[in-house]
Amino acid sequence: MTTLSPLTADDHDDWLSLWWGYLEFYETELTTAQTELTFARLTDPADAVYGVIARDDDGQGVGLVHWLTHPSTWSAGPYCYLEDLFVHRDARGSGVGAALIEHVRVWAAASGCDKVYWLTQRGNEKARELYDRVATDTDFMHYEIDLATNAPGAA
């Protein structure tokens, strides 16, 4: 049985292993400073970024989810952005991902949010099988401007 619990400082090593797996899956890197800042935010009750770790029967970390809320111009209630979701490859297909999404959905509903949403890569077919069962593909495209490389006034 999978157990979900809010992240605490005691979860650092297990979270870090999952976080690295998540970054590797998406073929990206973050600095150690950013990684530690992220964990500090996730474990600070005063911060508005939330996180949960999933553990298997042996207490091993098998998944993580991070989320935050923000106001919306389209809704009286806030929206909940599920920013990071990762399940260790050995636990995929076992219901861990669905349990993590359901945890966020229940939390968001109890917190007065009007919507939970997230992004994924088009080619992430295994995850999209789950997402298509629990949510609606809105067919919107995602665009972004990286201000570190495209700062205003930069040539």
Q: Would you name each region that the model predicts?
A:
Residues 16-41:
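Conserved GNAT-fold acetyl-CoA-binding loop/helix
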Residues 88, 99-115:
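Conserved acyl-CoA
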Residues 53, 60-69:
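Conserved beta-strand in the GNAT
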Residues 54, 93-98:
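Glycine-rich acyl-CoA binding loop
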Residues 68, 85-92:
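A short, internal acetyl-CoA/4′-phosphopantetheine-binding micro-motif in the GNAT/acyltransferase core
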Residues 3-17:
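A short beta-loop-alpha structural element at the N-terminal edge
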Residues 98, 110, 122-141:
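Conserved active-site alpha-helix within GNAT-family acetyltransferase domains
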Residues 41-53, 81:
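A short helix-loop-beta-strand connector motif used in the catalytic cores of GNAT acetyltransferases and
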